[in-house]
């Protein structure tokens, strides 16, 4: 959903009463004439005609300005009010100043009843919005009280709650998925009615060491601390570069008017449940914020660049006599400038987005939020009652019709074609008709939107650069970023995640044009604990930290073309895990020999499987100490059956009689081990071969003849006792020099070795990371693939984390086994 149409700002269409003038203009011009004309007549004899004329103009000019002047949609008197309020009525500098609740009782002659009565009077005046002008930083914060459950009381009897929500993948989604998300977000906005104002807050703040990802690689008493130091340095460097330390968070604050907290709380809880239900339908994780979390959020908004952690407990209020605002207020606020303000040591500027475009893209908000700058983007949204909205639009259409008639009359009087109308009038007429149709038949609602951007920077030059950059993005989409002159205080307090709006600039929008400001970009993967580093998010430029063992399934695959860095990424994960989680073990199945140098550097065991290699793995090895309910001999018999089937070959594989004979021989070969005799030795393939020759069935001789090549023949690589250290923490099995005749069998035996090692580690309480490089080779042969899929499914249940790597993602996609992996 790249673009949606935006309705024209119909507030520019004024209702004309008489003489083609609005009611405001008639009153102002009439008042000017009622005062100015008598003044002219009375002073004409004394001052002369010219002097009296200038006097009359001087008297009438303020009324003319009052009638005609507008700035940012505000009439003349409100512009003047903002200037007077900022320059004279309110102090420009607000210092941090506490109002300890115990202080009044310490004064001489202070009576308890008098103090309580004064406190009630002050709270009552503030609740009605009639409190005195803010004299301190604490008094600038507009809320009245914050409750532990997250309910906040604001002036005017408004109670609000806040929900924090996370991102989902929108930017990289398909067109169909983007359309579905847009439709769901539109329905979400339509949930709010005219009695439920809400605020969307998008906060970019620069994080510091305490809030950044922690590099959890502790030192150990081994030979790898130098590697740990180097790897830790790399991680810290990447974390420092991740979006230059910008953390992005998203919140929605909603409020309801109520007589008191008892009435507001249950209603807010119902709304909160509905909001979180709507987020869940969008697959957006969300979390309600309690009172302390909301205070921590306000603290972060009012302490830009601060490294101080938020320290607060509800017990601190009665113990210290301080209010909650004393824990979150900044050191100072300075609103003396018309276009900027100071908060602590930081500079700030509040601007609003003037939407002039006829259509908007879903990239506008995303591009603003992707900037490397500290900022708060706020969208205060007030739903207009549907009947009232339709009535208003019909009134605008009627006004446009009157303007058309007036223009046509002028055309007739002037002698030109009355069908020629001003282009703006035609555009407004068309847009108003379309807007009415949208409201009546297309499930659209009307919203009043206040879109503000608060930029913060450590110095004024950086601030102006950031504002200029945001303005450039707005201009790119045919919008304008305009500074709130003499309204910096109102803009700043409106940006706080309280649901309180003092900015009077509103833009009429429909559901679709409001929903196009989609707050989703890309899902971040940030997990705590023993999380490993997996690179940088290409869209958000944040680090990816994940603990695969905490996911629903730890299975994973590295996919990519040749040279794309699959092996490098797997080695980085392997090294990170080796240094971070010392109790876990690693097995690498390496067909190309790429991992051997790293494994040797980590003190692991490299097993080279090749005809001329001194390393041997005995496929007959069996571990009898397995968990209850498991039969190791039955599992070994199943493996040897599949091995013999691979050796015998043919389209039909082993026949039932052959399987029976093999199973009988396996039980005979392992008889001494099963009985637990001290003289029992681990058998070899040779033992199975000889046992088959002793059987009377001719099917046994057929299988034995097939095994002869691998027992007494030239390919007897696996007819030796295991002579390598298989209990090392890191084991790498290299299959690089295997010929085609041995490769299938080697792969099969390797799978069995991995399965047994994982079983043993699981029995000892250790997790195993099994890396299968070029794993598509394991899926070429149906029999090998079948056994590998069975092993793959078993690994997850045994506490294994199996990463697989391949560049051939289309290897037999029609095969069910490939799909199973």
What are these regions (language model features)?
Residues 56-60, 72-77, 88-94, 104-107, ...:
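Extended, folded cores of ATP/NTP-driven motor/assembly subunits in large transport
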Residues 45-60:
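Hydrophobic alpha-helical transmembrane segments
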Residues 64-82:
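Membrane-helix interfacial anchor on the cytosolic side
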Residues 13-39, 147, 152, 168, ...:
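Glycine-rich phosphate-binding loop of nucleotide-binding enzymes
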Residues 35, 39, 43, 62-63:
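Alpha-helical membrane-inserting segments
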Residues 168-169, 175-195, 205-208, 226-228, ...:
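P-loop NTPase motor domains
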Residues 1-9:
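Short, charged cytosolic
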């Amino acid at each position: 959903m790249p673009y949606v149409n935006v309705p024209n700002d119909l507030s520019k269409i004024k209702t004309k009463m008489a003489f083609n003038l609005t009611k405001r203009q008639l009153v102002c011009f009439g008042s000017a004439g009622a005062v100015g004309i008598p003044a002219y007549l009375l002073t004409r004899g004394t001052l002369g005609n010219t002097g009296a004329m200038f006097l009359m103009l001087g008297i009438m000019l303020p009324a003319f300005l009052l009638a005609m002047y507008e700035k940012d949609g505000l009439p003349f008197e409100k512009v003047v009010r903002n200037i007077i309020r900022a320059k004279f009525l309110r102090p420009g500098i607000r210092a941090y100043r506490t109002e300890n609740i115990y202080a009044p009782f310490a004064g001489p002659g202070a009576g308890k009843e008098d103090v309580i009565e004064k406190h009630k009077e002050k709270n009552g005046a503030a609740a009605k919005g009639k409190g005195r002008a803010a004299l301190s930083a604490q008094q600038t914060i507009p809320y009245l009280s914050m409750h532990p459950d997250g309910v906040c009381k604001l002036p005017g009897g408004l109670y609000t709650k806040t929900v924090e929500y996370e991102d989902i993948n929108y930017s990289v989604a398909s067109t169909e998925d983007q359309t579905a998300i847009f439709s769901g977000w539109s329905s979400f906005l339509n949930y709010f009615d005219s009695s439920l104002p809400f605020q969307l807050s998008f906060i970019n703040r620069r994080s510091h060491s305490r809030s950044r990802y922690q590099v959890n690689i502790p030192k150990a008493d081994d030979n790898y601390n130098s590697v740990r130091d180097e790897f830790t340095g790399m991680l810290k460097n990447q974390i420092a570069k991740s979006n230059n330390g910008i953390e992005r968070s998203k919140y929605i604050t909603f409020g309801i008017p109520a007589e008191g907290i008892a009435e507001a709380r249950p209603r807010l809880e119902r709304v909160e449940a509905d909001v979180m239900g709507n987020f869940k339908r969008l697959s957006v994780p969300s979390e309600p914020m309690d009172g302390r979390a909301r205070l921590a959020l306000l603290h972060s908004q009012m302490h830009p660049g601060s490294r101080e952690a938020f320290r607060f407990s509800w017990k601190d209020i009665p113990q210290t006599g301080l209010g909650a605002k004393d824990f979150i207020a900044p050191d100072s606020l300075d609103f003396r400038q018309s276009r900027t303000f100071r908060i602590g040591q930081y500079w700030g500027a509040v601007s609003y987005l003037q939407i002039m475009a006829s259509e908007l893209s879903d990239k506008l908000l995303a591009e603003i939020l992707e900037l490397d700058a500290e900022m708060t983007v706020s969208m205060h949204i007030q739903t207009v009652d549907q009947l009232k909205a339709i009535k208003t639009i019909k009134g605008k259409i009627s006004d446009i019709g009157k303007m058309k008639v007036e223009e046509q009359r002028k055309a007739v009087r002037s002698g030109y074609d009355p069908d020629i109308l001003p282009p703006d009038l035609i555009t407004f007429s068309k847009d108003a008709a379309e807007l009415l149709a949208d409201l009546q038949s297309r499930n659209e609602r009307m919203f009043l939107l206040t879109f503000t951007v608060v930029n913060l920077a450590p110095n004024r030059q950086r601030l102006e650069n950031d504002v200029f950059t945001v303005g450039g993005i707005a201009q790119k989409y045919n919008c304008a970023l305009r500074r709130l002159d003499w309204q910096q205080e109102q803009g700043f307090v409106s940006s706080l995640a309280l649901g309180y709006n003092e900015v009077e600039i509103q833009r009429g929008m429909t559901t679709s044009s409001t929903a196009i400001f989609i707050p989703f970009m890309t899902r971040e993967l940030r997990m705590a604990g023993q999380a490993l580093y997996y690179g940088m998010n290409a869209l958000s430029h944040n680090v990816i930290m994940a603990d695969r063992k905490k996911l629903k399934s730890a299975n994973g695959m590295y996919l990519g073309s040749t040279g794309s860095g699959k092996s490098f990424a797997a080695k980085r994960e392997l090294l990170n895990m080796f240094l971070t989680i010392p109790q876990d073990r690693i097995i690498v199945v390496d067909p190309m020999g790429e991992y051997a140098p790293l494994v040797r550097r980590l003190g692991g065991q490299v097993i080279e499987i090749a005809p001329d290699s001194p390393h041997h793995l005995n496929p007959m090895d069996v571990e009898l100490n397995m968990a209850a309910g498991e039969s190791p001999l039955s599992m070994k018999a199943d493996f040897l059956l599949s091995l013999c089937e691979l050796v015998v070959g043919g389209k039909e594989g082993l026949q039932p009689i052959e399987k029976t004979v093999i199973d009988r021989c396996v039980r005979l070969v392992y008889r001494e081990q099963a009985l637990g005799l001290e003289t029992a030795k681990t058998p070899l393939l040779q033992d199975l071969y000889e046992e088959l020759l002793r059987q009377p069935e001719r099917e046994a001789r057929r299988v034995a003849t097939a095994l002869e090549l691998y027992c007494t023949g030239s390919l007897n690589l696996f007819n030796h006792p295991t002579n390598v250290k298989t209990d090392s923490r890191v084991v790498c099995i290299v299959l690089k020099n295997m010929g085609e005749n041995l490769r299938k069998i080697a792969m099969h035996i390797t799978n069995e070795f991995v399965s047994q090692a994982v079983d043993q580690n699981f029995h000892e309480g250790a997790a195993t990371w099994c890396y299968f490089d070029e794993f598509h080779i394991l899926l070429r042969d149906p029999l090998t693939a079948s056994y590998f899929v069975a092993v793959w499914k078993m690994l997850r249940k045994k506490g294994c984390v199996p990463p697989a790597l391949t560049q051939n993602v289309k290897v037999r996609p029609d095969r069910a086994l490939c799909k199973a992996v």
